[in-house]
């Protein structure tokens, strides 16, 4: 991803992954792989927290995104997902029944269909150790696709490899929740690395 305002190359994940659910400070070190996967200081540092979308708790105030970005070296940022390939664009919308895929840290490459658009969901972050009351998220995408702890931050794509959503939660019955990707990009002021170039090139469609 690219941060539009600064031009910085960055990685994208969830607020609760990169920013400790609103508790991070700008510039906090980000490790890849994470400590749970064998990452160690200082060898695994890839950058620092650049920004996040705050999550409001209490179940009344509405949230749209649980997302965050961190800086990285230009050569480390790619509009590419292993197992899926190049991400071609940001999908303007997604239809019920659309076939989608994602690659997650825990469950790998899985596919499914979109079952709800415009959903309201209340993820419970307490099992992740944050000890917060549930938060209300509106206008979310729900897909019948496998996920597990560790998959948060995965990118959901459609059959044209367009970015559809950012995985942030789900249920044990296989209903997985995604922030709409266009809302994530707008909230964090980010774009795919070559998105602007495609839009400006004559005769191209993005």
Show the residue positions of the predicted features.
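Serine endopeptidase catalytic core focused on the charge-relay Asp
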Residues: 1-140, 144, 157-160, 164, ...
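Short, intrinsically disordered, mixed-charge
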Residues: 17-19, 186, 190
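Short beta-strand-to-coil "C-cap" segments at the C-terminal boundary of structured domains/repeats
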Residues: 72-74, 188-191
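Short, small/polar residue-rich loop motifs at catalytic or cofactor-binding pockets
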Residues: 148-151
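A short, polar/charged loop-to-alpha-helix boundary motif
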Residues: 173-185
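Charge-biased, low-complexity intrinsically disordered regions
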Residues: 193-196, 201-204
